[in-house]
């Protein structure tokens, strides 16, 4: 039975990811005054299926000088971790209701760094290695602010369980009392998922394609799926943390609809940002974090710790 539960979680995620690629190409197309994919199926709706068939039927080439085991393990690990991070997400009921769901998600996102590092190193290519090193530095750096922002939100929530955030936000979304944190969180999620304007790991102009330059066919598709699964997952987390969807226990499907709409809007924001902004320079990316975001998040975290103590109140759900 539990196996069926897992399958019923994984298949919709993979479908959502497949159609997100289509949405991205359509949105970018219309923003650049062109049509986007419109040949395969009505209005190009079957394009993701055609892409999947093409990628998985091609021969998976491997450079002769690459380290075979790591080269193959890296994309599998990337997708496995991307899917594992969905387990504690309340939609409105999680697959496993963990006591420390937030901590689990942070740990999993930290592990994702290894798949990037292995793929870059195992490819035995200069471009792949530079891309991997950039990705690792960027991901590890932005995880610092993500963790501090999460801590501040959890102080208002009063528990490490994500499900209790639904109850905390019954009267007011947390974006109102913590809007500077929400802004920094959104930008940090962009950097964490390697999206434009922080897509330095894939800098086409300088690094060909970044850490996955030597990958083709199936393994490349796995990296691609992992990246987009992470994008949707990060937007879901943003929705749960700051835009608590309305939840009526007698009609949980209303919650799911509300929650999906908010996640979709945030995902389209990601695509809009990609269409609008040029890529950051690497030093600007690091300065933004270590000199701007980190001091600000630390100050706001201290503020959120001090406020309940000063007003002698306790957070809900303790």
Swiss-Prot record:
The keyword Ubl conjugation does not apply. The gene is MT-ND1. Core subunit of respiratory chain NADH dehydrogenase (Complex I) which is composed of 45 different subunits. It comes from Canis lupus familiaris (Dog). Keywords: Electron transport, Membrane, Mitochondrion, Mitochondrion inner membrane, NAD, Respiratory chain, Translocase, Transmembrane, Transmembrane helix, Transport, Ubiquinone. One of its GO terms (molecular function) is NADH dehydrogenase (ubiquinone) activity. The keyword Thylakoid does not apply. InterPro entries: NADH_UbQ_OxRdtase_su1/FPO, NADH_UbQ_OxRdtase_su1_CS. Its EC number is 7.1.1.2. The lineage of its organism: Eukaryota, Metazoa, Chordata, Craniata, Vertebrata. It is a multi-pass membrane protein. It holds the Pfam family NADHdh. One of its GO terms (biological process) is mitochondrial respiratory chain complex I assembly. This is NADH-ubiquinone oxidoreductase chain 1. It is found in: Mitochondrion inner membrane. Core subunit of the mitochondrial membrane respiratory chain NADH dehydrogenase (Complex I) which catalyzes electron transfer from NADH through the respiratory chain, using ubiquinone as an electron acceptor. Essential for the catalytic activity and assembly of complex I. It is an enzyme of class 7 (translocase). Belongs to the complex I subunit 1 family. One of its GO terms (cellular component) is mitochondrial inner membrane.
